[in-house]
Regions:
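Boundary segments of small protein-protein interaction reader/adaptor domains
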Residues: 1-128, 134-139, 145-154
Length: 155
């Protein structure tokens, strides 16, 4: 599995699309800027620290603990764009609100996934906004629904 080369914690491949372009929101110009990341995109579940807990035993975390984790052991899901333009790939980890302290959710520190006409918008735990452009609208809609599931906005 190619993804395991980049993330050895992969558990199961959930979705793959043949082509995605990553945009990053530039607050200075208040517009999207095309990045150099483009290629096949994969969404997958990962083995994580949470595999050892029952739902009612989950210890709530602050965002800095998650962001500062050395190997991403807290993320339940991953997204990876295998970059065709350069050797460096684009990746994001996903974790639902139920793992976060309530204060982090109330201060808007949680992950955010939205959909515009052309982009799936993801705000990570660092507050950076990325736009995922997928050519096929049906594939884009499916990926949006899957990412919403990954952050537990859909059951």
């Amino acid at each position: 599995n190619v993804i395991a080369k980049y993330d050895p914690s992969i558990s199961q491949l959930l979705h793959i699309s043949s082509y995605c372009v990553i945009y990053q929101y530039d607050e200075d110009i208040e517009d999207w800027t095309k990045s150099s990341y483009m290629g096949p995109i994969a969404v997958y579940s990962r083995r994580s620290i949470w595999d050892n807990y029952r739902d009612d035993d989950i210890k709530k975390l602050d965002v800095q603990t998650i962001v500062n984790s050395e190997h991403g052991e807290y993320y339940r899901f991953g997204l990876l764009v295998l970059n065709r333009a350069q050797p460096e790939n684009f990746s994001l980890g996903f974790l639902g609100d139920k793992y976060l302290k309530q204060s982090e959710i109330e201060s808007d520190q949680n992950l955010l996934v939205e959909k515009s006409d052309e982009l799936i918008i993801v705000r990570d735990f660092n507050g950076k906004a990325f736009g995922l452009w997928i050519f096929d609208p049906k594939d884009r809609d499916y990926l949006y629904q899957l990412l919403m599931y990954c952050i537990e906005k859909l059951e």
